Amino acid sequence: MLASRALSLIGKRAISTSVCLRAHGSVVKSEDYAFPTYADRRDYPLPDVAHVTMLSASQKALKEKEKADWSSLSRDEKVQLYRIQFNESFAEMNRGTNEWKTVVGMAMFFIGFTALVLIWEKSYVYGPIPHTFDRDWVAMQTKRMLDMKANPIQGFSAKWDYDKNEWKK
């Protein structure tokens, strides 16, 4: 009775310990999608919020200058204002990546590796080609089947002209 009680307690302790071990992992911060977020996307060109939300003193001064006439702004100031609002331009978003080179390279690597495996298998795993694949053997087997008149109605021998000793046309 004492042994069964001890095993029962040990079992409960083991189960509760494993649950605690599984449950004590790091806390995952949940994203609140109720608030607008910034994203550079071609199909959604005007995000809900600006790229830079915490403005520095120079950026705040530039935003105040933006409220005046835009002809007084220099080209660099206009670019800085654009970069406050957007992270990338359409040209930068549409710029091709070099990821295709990696994909093609990996595909070629695996094709080459597979070819090496096949060459190794042909050299060391597979035996010699059976003699039944030899042209002479196939010719003798064909002649034997014709001599035996194998499947004379719809099959092999039906396509042979025994009078002319040639295949029917």
UniProtKB/Swiss-Prot annotation:
Pfam family, one: COX4
Name the UniProt record assigns to this protein: Cytochrome c oxidase subunit 4 isoform 1, mitochondrial
Chain positions found as Phosphoserine: S56, S58
Function per UniProt: Component of the cytochrome c oxidase, the last enzyme in the mitochondrial electron transport chain which drives oxidative phosphorylation. The respiratory chain contains 3 multisubunit complexes succinate dehydrogenase (complex II, CII), ubiquinol-cytochrome c oxidoreductase (cytochrome b-c1 complex, complex III, CIII) and cytochrome c oxidase (complex IV, CIV), that cooperate to transfer electrons derived from NADH and succinate to molecular oxygen, creating an electrochemical gradient over the inner membrane that drives transmembrane transport and the ATP synthase.
Recorded topology in the membrane: Single-pass membrane protein
Lineage of the organism: Eukaryota, Metazoa, Chordata, Craniata, Vertebrata
Mitochondrial matrix topological domain residue ranges: 23-99
Database matches in PANTHER family: CYTOCHROME C OXIDASE SUBUNIT 4 ISOFORM 1, MITOCHONDRIAL (PTHR10707:SF12), CYTOCHROME C OXIDASE SUBUNIT IV (PTHR10707)
Homology family: Belongs to the cytochrome c oxidase IV family.
Subcellular location: Mitochondrion inner membrane
InterPro entries with a match to the protein in the record: Cyt_c_oxidase_su4, Cyt_c_oxidase_su4_fam, Cyt_c_oxidase_su4_sf
Protein's gene: Cox4i1
